[in-house]
């Protein structure tokens, strides 16, 4: 996928957020600077490479200094990346992030008790204040709730919430919602057993 195709996919993701156009979201521009640095750092540009990397560094300095967003150009991020309220967000350079991932403010994705760095699947949403630590995998279509600390892998299609933290399959939540719509009493679902 080309640089412009990735930016278009990101812009489409932002156009659905809050009814505002993509160019009015600060997170889009943070992502655009990352994508520029990633592309320049990995492309065989010959003598143009170093002046373009210098431009990337000039653009990245205010992002790190003012917004406190650490998004190294070595991070691998799929198209459709969206950061709402891009403040105090930290990624290690080796992180692998899937397609159509949404990140909110105060999120830390980094090293932890298990070796390695996290991997986020496709269509993952990470809400404000969440911490994903260590060599864990967050499956596709997961939602990580606000202020949750994750140190174990999460299977696909789960919602992880705080107090107490547990992973609930989205199918279970859908069935609960259907039952409530029909006027049935809901029963709390059993949490999944997590494995390393």
Show where each model-derived region lies.
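Structural signal for interior beta-strand "rungs" in well-ordered beta-sheet cores
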Residues: 65-168
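Terminal amphipathic alpha-helical/low-complexity segments used for targeting or macromolecular assembly
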Residues: 1-67, 173-196
